[in-house]
UniProtKB/Swiss-Prot annotation:
Annotated binding of Zn(2+), by residue: C890, C892, C901, H902
Record has Cytoplasm as a keyword: yes
Function per UniProt: Part of the Sec protein translocase complex. Interacts with the SecYEG preprotein conducting channel. Has a central role in coupling the hydrolysis of ATP to the transfer of proteins into and across the cell membrane, serving both as a receptor for the preprotein-SecB complex and as an ATP-driven molecular motor driving the stepwise translocation of polypeptide chains across the membrane.
Domain of life of the source: Bacteria
Places the protein is found: Cell inner membrane; Cytoplasm
Entry's cofactor comment: May bind 1 zinc ion per subunit.
Gene: secA
Cofactor: Zn(2+)
Record's GO cellular component terms: cell envelope Sec protein transport complex; cytosol; plasma membrane
Topology class, membrane: Peripheral membrane protein
Organism: Rickettsia akari (strain Hartford)
Protein name per the record: Protein translocase subunit SecA
SUBUNIT field: Monomer and homodimer. Part of the essential Sec protein translocation apparatus which comprises SecA, SecYEG and auxiliary proteins SecDF-YajC and YidC.
Any Gene Ontology biological process: protein import
Amino acid sequence: MLSILKKLFGTANDRTVKKLFSEITKINSLEHAIQKLSDEELKNKTVEFKEKLKNGATLDDIVYEAFAVVREAARRVCGMRHFDVQLIGGLILHRGMITEMRTGEGKTLVATLPAYLNALTGKGVHVVTVNDYLARRDSAAMGKIYNFLGLSVGCIVAGMPDEAKRAAYNADITHATNNELGFDYLRDNMKYSLQERVLRPFNFAIIDEVDSILIDEARTPLVISGPVNDNSELYGKIDKIVRLLNINDFEKDEKLKTINLTETGITHIESLLSKEGIIKPDTGLYDFENLTLVHYVNQALRAHNMFTVDVDYLVREGKVMIIDEFTGRVMEGRRYSEGLHQALEAKENVKIQNENQTLASVTFQNYFRNYPKLSGMTGTAMTEAPELKDIYNLDVVAVPTHNKVTRLDLDDEIYGSKKEKYDAILKLIKDCYDRGQPILVGTISIEKSEELSSVLNAEKIPHKVLNAKFHEQEACIIAQAGRFKAVTIATNMAGRGTDIMLGGNPEMLIEHLDKDHNYAAKIDEIKAQIAEEKKQVIEAGGLFVIGTERHESRRIDNQLRGRSGRQGDPGKTKFFLSLDDDLMRIFASDRISGVLRTLGLKDGEAIQHPMISRSLEKAQQKVEGYNYEMRKNLLRFDDVMNDQRKIIYEQRTEIIKSKDSYGFLNSTTEELAKKIVLAFMPVGSYREDWDIENLSVELHRVFAIKFDHNLVSKSDVTEEEITKIVIQMAHDVYKSKEEAYSSELMHNAVKYILLTTLDQVWKDHLYSLDHLRQGISLRAYAQKDPLSEYKREAFNLFEQMLNNLKELFIQAVYHFHIDLKHVQKEDVSLERKKLQNNMRESREDPAFSKYNAGSSLETHLKPVVSRIDPKDRNPDDPTSWGRVSRNELCPCSSGKKYKYCHGAHE
């Protein structure tokens, strides 16, 4: 019934596209008049549009004329005229939706339309890409159009100094990678003045390959972290022990990606740990004193049994580098958290980096939801439309192609074993190669791509391998994959964003030419050669895309197919599968094996049957649903932290903007003074119950004041009067500092102390939230909702953090002095440069190994309350402990963390 209605009335997508086509006629009707304009008159349209907006017009009032202007500018500057379907794509993007356009339909050119229109407001537009190469390429190519029309263009890539970034972000249109945008957002919220920040307020973002960024990378947060204790030796010892375990010592679930020790395994590892002297002979792994070791053992188990080199990560230049499972690219600067990366480093016998503590983090889900207006484009989004709508409130509209798709998608072939599958793939590659038909072979991992490469080398078939190991050559290799007799093996969707043109890409070949006296002749020669090869390739059948196995997501399979049949070109696609493939083995093995037995699968024979295709699709849908729920669940939990993050970042900005730091200091001083006095002189208590001795100690610890015991000797004195006296004494301490250092310097010092203290407590709070999150799922066993419990406890922790902030801030303000000899403007400038350098260097490894937030004041602020060597602390005398980190073990020897022991009421 539903299918009949769709045929009669069309789908919702069909109706949307039909309506948009009617709007395109309005743009086309302006084309003739716009073409008559001189270059100068065309450029002046930008000034005219800005004036209209200034006088109250909206973007929708000028959208048709603006699009017509961009179309004409592109024709004059680049020789490219926007097709009608590209204009439709532009309207979809302008209206804050996602446009699905097939590979080769010119998405980069489409983005110029909404980017130009929205940049007219002067608030900036971000065009987001997945890597630096695409950001540079698109800003250079499309920048010519924007510059012609009088708009400025910026490009953000990794490693740029802040000055250059600031200029790029202040441009009308900025091309940047999703990673750099996210990290700049975090870095900006760690800066100590508004002038040091690089980003402008969020306005409008157009995300290229939107499915890759908002879905594939949604579960991986961007993290800026700093070093904690060095446990590299322990990781090495545990790694050697885990290598001695056998297959009966643990059990793993590949569907859920979990691994646990069995009873036999626990006994075995306890004997090994005892033998190495890591635990005492009469203790067990799960005894209280050894509980910290469980984490190291679990991560070593995961490293050895759940992670595979050249599949999940690779080792390059003595470093373990993560591979993106969806793109096959190395995830530069990313490290696994919770000690897993250190366990992998121990496994691969490379230098073990220090563990890190999170200083700031954000997921792409929450970063991109900061934009008031968001849109995106990709070749494959319809399969994920419900998720994009649910999480980002983004509708997806599929735009028809300019030319009809003539690509032929052949049925899958399924074999009993991997060897039989590879034999069939090799036979097809040989056939295609002999007739000159270019072939692109898609694999799901580096390991598989190199395995297949070895098979082709043995057969002496020339080919190129495109995977994370050759990331730098990615665009060049993929661009020439359509040449005559070209054989290219690509990891998953490596090279995405670069079109495969039949016959080859002349522009990339021309880029590498030497500009000598024969330069023009060489260009003509290359163009002629490419044109001839294109004819040969079309005659051979176009690009043949071969998939070596199905991915967990149908969308990734569709992306691979989409590399062929660009702009109406001929082409074919085919997937070869075996029962050994991960998807088949883990999710669909029983069902499909039964079907194959029924159909009578023989060695070396392939099965092609609709039942198998349906079973595979069901398996993929099951995995997609599971991954969607995981991302949705992640967002629910991350939203709790995100709300708190927004509050902290807003407060931080207010502090930086504030011209009067005395207000917060004054109110907090009064609040703490009252709290301390009431703690030792409770309301309604008898005078003999007052603890004046400890009141004096506490007032000195917090406010650096010497409290005179005689003040409470009067019989009629009340706790209110004592509170007023304490507040006045604290104010006197502050005034004496102002007289010594000047009001301006004190204002800067107080602001600096407040910011550094806020950063410290926020860092500790993130650590607490991480630990809370790790164990919260266990609440389900007590019939409690883990999310509700997490919200409740996270709120309590947040309140506790704010209380800690107040006390640590007040304590620091009243206990410091400044070395006036050294506070110079030059010092401030130098320290800021050092900070920027450290932050930039840390992008290579997101651990802020040298992170030292602050200005030169930090060097010259000398607090009386400092950290004391643990050996010098007396467990029975808290006054000898100095400052204790909330996550340290309490110096009283209770075995608890300080925040759960003596620090519980701070």
